[in-house]
Every structure is written in structure tokens, then in C-alpha cells.
A protein has these predicted regions:
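N-terminal anchoring/stem segment of glycosyltransferases
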Residues: 27-106, 119-120, 174
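Catalytic core and acceptor-binding pocket of nucleotide-sugar-dependent glycosyltransferases
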Residues: 174-225
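Short, hydrophobic beta-strand segments that form beta-sheet elements in well-ordered domains
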Residues: 77-86, 124-125, 148-151, 212
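A residue-level signal for conserved active-site and pocket-lining positions in enzyme catalytic cores
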Residues: 81, 114, 130, 170, ...
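A short acidic, often aromatic-flanked loop/helix-cap motif at beta-alpha or helix-coil junctions
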Residues: 89-91, 102-107, 156-158, 218-224
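Basic, mixed-charge low-complexity alpha-helical segments
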Residues: 7-32
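Residues that flank catalytic or metal-binding motifs in active/ligand-binding sites
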Residues: 46, 77, 93, 110, ...
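GT-A fold catalytic core of metal-dependent nucleotide-sugar glycosyltransferases
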Residues: 89-92, 97-99, 111-162, 172
């Protein structure tokens, strides 16, 4: 495992990261002796996941593979790569494929990633395929570990107090935001008429379970900032 640059973290963040790594090591040791009857959720051990979504032809499998390679270079926490897609051709063999339900289109595929019925168990760090990773991302897993996290929409560059979310990076526990999916799929057309896109819907659907926002300086837009 690569050495972590301690200078990237505050004192409190470093304590959280050390605790996270210690817990991960203990969990890995536990998993080696765990009997099937002791695995309580879905029969799956808990993992950290990097998730992306590829639908249609806007982004090729190369984008998925490049994102995977970027995470390998810049993450020292054990993870599994997951891609939600309607076409798995060309993906790296280490990437776990989850098929998208039929009928979803464009950014309205995104609510599916919050479903509790995905065949995974643990913590998901979702990234859009146009995200470029420039530094270590361990703290995206360790920041505010008891909450779900996302970033402020990049309208913040023009309106500093802008409260709405940008769904290009979201971290959550599997099943934690299941209602974002179930409330959407109950009447997709009604949601689409009222909300411009998936991140507007995410903001509305989680009003009673608001996100902790990553610091603006951690994730920035090359276009707006």
C-alpha cells in the first residue's frame, strides 16, 4: 500500500483516517474467519466502492477505465470499482458491472444508484465519468463518516451562498438514500416535470436527510472556478 502524505490532512482528519484504516484492517481480518451465517446484510461483506455510471454513447468504456486507473493511483483505501451501465463491453475485467434497468435515460439513470437492492453492501463513493482526480482521495471516504456527503453545485462560483447539490460526486451507504430511487420510480414523469435534472431531485428528495457538504476547495470545476 502506498504511503499517505500526512501533510494533506488536518490533525482531526488524520485521526479519522487512521481510525478508518485501523477499522478496515480489522474488518479484513474478521472477514477471513467469518461464517456465512454471520454476514447479516444480503450475504455480502461490507466494502468501499467507487461507482460510476455509463449510459448510451456519450462516454466510452475508456472513460470508465481511466477513472478506475485514476482511483488506483490516488486512493490507498481498499475499494472495488462498480459501473452501472447498459453496455459493459470494453470495461476492465476488475470492474464489477451492474446492469441498469430498462427505460432509464440520461441523467435520470442516476436515482437508481441509491437503490437498496443493488448487489453490493457498504460505502459508495460515486463519481461522474468526466471527473479528473488530481490528488489523494482517501478523505472523501473518511470525511463525516456517519453522514452522506456531496458537493455544492458550481453555481456557487457566482452565488456564494448557493445551497443546492452537484451530483458529480456523492458518498453514501448502500440503502441510506433508497427513497431517492423509490420515490422517483413511483412516478418518473411527475418528477421530471417538476425537476430539471437528477441533482435537483436529489436536493428535494433528501430535505429531511440533508447532506454534509465536502469543502468547496476539495472539488472544483475547471469550467466555472
Amino acid at each position: 500500500m502506498a504511503k499517505i502524505d500526512k501533510s494533506l490532512y488536518t490533525k482531526d482528519e488524520w485521526k479519522v483516517l487512521k481510525a478508518q484504516r485501523k477499522a478496515n484492517k480489522a474488518q479484513r481480518n474478521l472477514n477471513t474467519t467469518l461464517q456465512p451465517s454471520q454476514v447479516l446484510v444480503k450475504g455480502l461483506e461490507e466494502k468501499n466502492y467507487i461507482m460510476c455510471l455509463k449510459h448510451g454513447t456519450k462516454y466510452s468504456s475508456d472513460y470508465v477505465n481511466k477513472l478506475y486507473n485514476g482511483v488506483l493511483r490516488h486512493c490507498t483505501i481498499d475499494f472495488e470499482m462498480v459501473c452501472l451501465t447498459d453496455d459493459p463491453r470494453g470495461l476492465h475485467p476488475n470492474i464489477k458491472v451492474i446492469s441498469l434497468p430498462a427505460g432509464l435515460q440520461g441523467w435520470w439513470c442516476k436515482p437508481y444508484m441509491y437503490s437498496k437492492d443493488l448487489p453490493i453492501n457498504g460505502v459508495v463513493l460515486y463519481m461522474d465519468l468526466d471527473v479528473v482526480i488530481a490528488a489523494n482521495i482517501d478523505k472523501l471516504f473518511s470525511y463525516q463518516p456517519d453522514n452522506w456527503c456531496t458537493i455544492r453545485d458550481f453555481t456557487r462560483a457566482m452565488r456564494p451562498k448557493w445551497p443546492k447539490y452537484n451530483s458529480s460526486i456523492v458518498r453514501f451507504k448502500v440503502g441510506q438514500l433508497d427513497s431517492v430511487w423509490t420515490d422517483y420510480i413511483r412516478d418518473p414523469k411527475a418528477v421530471q416535470r417538476k425537476h430539471f435534472g437528477d441533482q435537483d431531485w436529489l436536493f428535494e428528495a433528501t430535505r429531511q436527510q440533508q447532506a454534509m457538504l465536502y469543502p468547496d476547495s476539495w472539488i472544483q470545476s475547471w469550467k466555472w472556478e
